[in-house]
Swiss-Prot record:
Belongs to the bacterial ribosomal protein bL35 family. Disulfide bonds: none annotated. The gene is rpl35. It is found in: Plastid, Chloroplast. It comes from Trieres chinensis. This is Large ribosomal subunit protein bL35c. GO terms for biological process: translation.
Length: 64
């Protein structure tokens, strides 16, 4: 049986924790930041866990 390929786009976006959950960054933090408030930018900088429903397809994309 051939080896499973890792989706490189998912590898760049998600990080797997020791418990098997995935971490991700917030959207809307790339550009056009002058019109956003400091509070909004600070909250968008935090890293959050992916929900359980969204983590199932990520597990298929990141087999190792």
């Amino acid at each position: 049986m051939p080896k499973l390929k890792t989706r490189k786009a998912a590898l760049k976006r998600y990080k797997k924790t020791a418990t098997g959950k995935f971490l991700r960054r917030h959207a809307y933090k790339g550009h056009l930041l002058m019109k956003k408030s400091k509070t909004q930018k600070r909250k968008l900088s935090q890293i959050i866990c992916v929900s359980n429903n969204d983590s199932k397809p990520i597990k298929l994309m990141l087999p190792y």
